[in-house]
Amino acid sequence: MEKKRLLLITQELAPYTEGTDISELVGKLPKFFADQGYELRILMPRFGVVNERRHRLHEVVRLSGMNIIVDDDDYPLLIKVASLPGSRLQVYFLDNEEFFKRKMVFEDDKGHPFEDNADRAAFFCKGAIETVKKFGWPPDFIMCQGWMTSLLPLYLRTAYKTEPIFANAQIIYGAYDTPHEHEGGERFFQKAAINNLTKKHLEPYRNGEGVSMHKGAAHYADAVIIGSESLDTNVPYLSVAGDKPVLPWQPADEALPGYLEFFKSLTESVAA
């Protein structure tokens, strides 16, 4: 039987970033799914907290050199790679000096969110899609973990909907209880509107007068995973998911088997 291809795009991943629910859980997923017979590609931002020397990151010249446009500004995309400790899996890091050189992840040293977090999210999501196109590797599943990946379901279902490489992929969005998924305001909508997307395309991300990145991602994704215990499956943004499959939060000792069964059910639903 041909291996299923899983594209994992995450904002955080242990051991490169540590100390959050998402980094610790997502850090366990690659080896687990590889052991279950899945073929994986893993992408994440190269935040300034990632120790390049310790983790032996090096540039992938054939993938680097693209310019990613965000709100009519061009930003060079650099791709680096490292081997995930304890496995033969590789992690691809998306880097840009303006967005990711700083030695903090989403907030400054006073706890204030970076003003350009929306720009960084748009750059990362578009850059991830363009990188996978260069891979020439059509995934069966695209798992997007965390608010910074919340634009991926939108982009894949609109701006990139005619790309053959993504034609058969199911998009799964993982929502976590983090303090940044409501940030950005009108700046978010301005920066997120790549490739001539309109206000109508971005409307699902509106939450009253503000932003809900989880709500927008749930609207465009094929399935949703609840990654934090504090997020209940009855939260308002899940209403836009309709009858889409939802995997509720599960304690650590049940999470990995729960993921596996969830993915099996998604495979069966396509085959039915």
Identify the function of each model-found stretch.
Residues M1-A272:
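Catalytic cores of nucleotide-sugar-dependent glycosyltransferases that transfer UDP/GDP/TDP-activated
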